[in-house]
Amino acid sequence: LDSNRIEDLSPLGRLTGVNDMSLGTNQIRDVFPLRRLIRMVKLNLSNNEIRDLGPLVKLIALEELNFNRNDVSSLAFVANMQKLRVLNCSTNLIEDISPLLDLPALTRVSLQGNPLSDKAKAHARELIDRGVTVIAPQ
């Protein structure tokens, strides 16, 4: 569903059996309709107009999540995503990455293009020490 000028995700909210969805390069602002897609394992929301991914908090089966090139400022919604392995949240408005510290399956995270705080940069070093591949500004 990439590059289709999609704005309204309401029709997709009924696809509760879907486990892989790519919605990159659209005009999405509201992800609330995706909140029931709890079987989702891989989700691409890159290059949209999203500010809040909070409605995804119950998508705890996610293993790969890409939302680069949006306007997201908080990672709090990933706190319970224990299966999340790969996260691309580059080019957003993220300053705090502390929710990533409690994700045991995380192997790769892309953070470049975010206004990371000094504390977030220290957290990135902690992730690297744990063996996570971190792509971030120095």
Model-derived features: where do they sit?
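Concave beta-strand-loop units of leucine-rich repeat
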Residues: L1-E7, P11-E95, P99-A122, I128-Q138
